[in-house]
């Protein structure tokens, strides 16, 4: 416990209620550090301040606590819902358990008539209207399914803006992956049948599809329509090939299967998704968690995952360990998603097979993670020896621009668990001379550390000049930061980097140094993040800057224009008459746009 806050904390602990509720741990400046729920507030909050706590992250949290606030609730379920709402609203640093919290990928069939498209996207129903299938654990697995659908049913996957502008079939038609509805080479009725078959495939109804294709092939052969018979034969062959690769179970249902394990300070949770009796795959998570009881840890993970990340919850959740608050979690999930949810830890037959598969995968995943974890720990250890001080958190900055255009500064964050992508930041640099990297770095550092805490090591990509500029910024902010500048070697060849320290010393580490490998890893990630964000900003600016000069053309109509023609090149090629087709534009504005673009 922080000694300065001890009297205040002890007074709070003495007056805590034994009712259920939510507690908030606050730092020196009143910042929210952690939100938790409790069946008994007095017992739970007091447990943080006993001498036997060994978990490093818990110790770090307790050392920063200066105040505690509590909110009493009528039930544990209410406490759980309130806790998750507060986490979603405030994102306290010690509650962040998932390093990768991207939404899952779904395949959707759009509601466009008469020619719907099939595509994939993150999140369910956020930007599209139609039927959704999934979740798929990765974009790769979703793309793999889309490729199969293209080959089987030739349903279009192109954007509407591209589809509406086609005058002749595209390459997808030439390689037999689309029936070219854009130019009318397929009737709406035949296309609708292909869409319906795609939906049946996504729903797992492959057995009936198989029988229908056999019947159509035999009928075509009987009618001496051999070309059509070959077409159905090829589809049937591909469908059987796909069926052989998929894990299909006898039970037609939906479930998520979750298995947790803990080894050598690393926690792993494996989630497998079964929909319509088909195993869609799974994903491994390595959450930063407080606690020692696997059941409670899995319960905390599930609350975080289903309330903060997932877009849906299946009717069954199968787990490899009993949860102490199973009933409360079921009730909270039912309230959140409006459906009954059952959590089961004792299962038989097919469900036992699912759980066994998840447990096999969680053991495989943690072995790989432990290997990476040990390597990363060794890299941190060697870097600590090089710099002569303990390091847990590293931040690195990089600047990216194209001849001074659309400058972006990136800040990436690493700790001994790897990249903390949720802590990454980007800074759009403004009001500087084009191409002035020093001014860009100065602005980024100032904006970052006016409020944010300093890391154990601040890496500055750029060497001595950038390091001196960073030292000036820290002096202006009244901060003492441990900083190292990294300059590239001759020919920018990896392994020849020089490290510059604030006292003027510099060293060049051996090419096989693990400390150097860590620095390269962090620096390269900062470069990747910066250049990705810069290109996105630059391309967006280039595509809209011409249109921004047109009076009376606001952001919405610019967006509609670009969407309709598939980009700025399509707008430039459009005739005045074609421009009038864009909804909400009108003849006068179309004439103005055409005149300005073609002056």
Swiss-Prot record:
BP terms from Gene Ontology: nucleotide-excision repair; SOS response
PROSITE patterns in UniProt: GIY_YIG, UVR, UVRC
Localization of this protein: Cytoplasm
Stretches that traverse the bilayer: none
Domain UVR: 207-242
Predominant subcellular localization, coarse grouping: cytoplasm
Domain GIY-YIG: 18-96
Short name of one Pfam family: UVR
Gene Ontology annotations for the cellular component aspect, listed alphabetically: cytoplasm; excinuclease repair complex
Keyword DNA damage: yes
Gene Ontology MF terms: DNA binding; excinuclease ABC activity
Keyword hit for DNA repair: yes
Subunit relationships: Interacts with UvrB in an incision complex.
Family, per entry: Belongs to the UvrC family.
Stated name of the protein: UvrABC system protein C
Species assigned in the record: Acinetobacter baumannii (strain SDF)
The gene coding this protein: uvrC
């Amino acid at each position: 416990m922080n000694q300065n806050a001890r009297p205040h904390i002890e007074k709070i602990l003495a007056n805590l209620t034994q009712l259920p509720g939510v507690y908030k741990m606050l730092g020196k400046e009143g910042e929210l550090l952690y939100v938790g729920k409790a069946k008994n507030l007095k017992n739970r909050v007091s447990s943080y301040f006993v001498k036997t706590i060994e978990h490093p992250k818990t110790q770090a949290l307790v050392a920063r606590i200066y105040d505690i606030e509590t909110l009493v609730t009528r039930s544990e379920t209410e406490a759980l819902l309130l806790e998750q709402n507060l986490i979603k609203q405030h994102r306290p640093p010690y509650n962040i358990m998932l390093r990768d919290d991207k939404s899952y990928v779904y395949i959707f069939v759009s509601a466009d008539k008469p020619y719907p498209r099939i595509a994939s996207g993150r999140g369910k129903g956020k930007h599209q209207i139609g039927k959704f299938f999934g979740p798929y654990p990765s974009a790769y697995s979703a793309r793999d399914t889309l490729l199969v659908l293209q080959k089987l049913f030739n349903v279009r996957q192109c954007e509407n803006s591209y589809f509406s502008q086609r005058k002749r079939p595209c390459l997808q038609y030439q390689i037999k992956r689309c029936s070219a509805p854009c130019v009318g080479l397929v009737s709406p009725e035949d296309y609708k049948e292909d869409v319906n078959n795609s939906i049946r495939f996504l729903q797992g109804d492959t057995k009936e599809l198989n029988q229908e294709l056999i019947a159509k092939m035999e009928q075509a052969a009987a009618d001496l329509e051999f070309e059509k018979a070959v077409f159905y034969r090829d589809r049937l062959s591909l469908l059987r090939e796909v069926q052989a690769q998929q894990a299909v179970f006898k039970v037609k249902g939906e479930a998520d299967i979750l298995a947790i394990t803990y080894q050598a300070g690393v926690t792993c949770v494996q989630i497998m998704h079964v929909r319509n009796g088909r195993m869609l795959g799974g994903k491994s998570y390595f959450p930063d968690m407080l606690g020692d009881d696997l059941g409670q840890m899995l319960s905390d993970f599930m609350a975080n995952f289903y309330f903060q990340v997932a877009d849906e919850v299946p009717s069954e959740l199968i787990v490899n360990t009993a949860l102490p608050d199973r009933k409360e979690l079921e009730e909270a999930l039912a309230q959140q998603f409006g459906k009954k949810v059952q959590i089961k830890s004792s299962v038989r037959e097919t469900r036992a097979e699912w759980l066994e598969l998840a447990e096999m995968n969680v053991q495989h995943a943690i072995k790989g993670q432990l290997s990476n974890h040990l390597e990363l720990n060794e890299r941190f250890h060697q870097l600590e020896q090089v710099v002569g001080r303990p390091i847990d958190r590293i931040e690195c900055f990089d600047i990216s621009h194209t001849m001074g255009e659309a400058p972006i500064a990136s800040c990436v964050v690493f700790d001994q668990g790897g990249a903390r992508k949720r802590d990454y930041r980007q800074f759009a640099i403004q009001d500087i001379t084009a191409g002035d990297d020093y001014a860009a770095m100065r602005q980024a550092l100032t904006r970052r550390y006016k409020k944010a805490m300093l890391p154990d090591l601040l890496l500055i990509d750029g060497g001595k000049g950038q390091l001196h500029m960073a030292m000036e910024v820290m002096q202006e902010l009244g901060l003492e930061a441990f900083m190292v500048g990294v300059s590239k070697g001759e020919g920018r060849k990896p392994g020849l980097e020089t490290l510059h320290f604030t006292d003027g010393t510099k060293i060049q580490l051996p090419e096989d140094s693990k400390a150097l490998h860590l620095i390269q890893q962090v620096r390269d990630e900062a470069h990747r993040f910066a250049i990705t964000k810069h290109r996105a900003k630059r391309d967006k600016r280039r595509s809209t800057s011409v249109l921004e000069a047109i009076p009376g053309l606001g952001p919405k109509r610019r967006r509609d224009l670009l969407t309709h023609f598939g980009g700025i090149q399509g707008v430039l090629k459009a005739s005045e008459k074609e421009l009038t087709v864009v909804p909400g534009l009108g003849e006068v504005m179309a004439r103005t746009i055409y005149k300005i673009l073609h002056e």
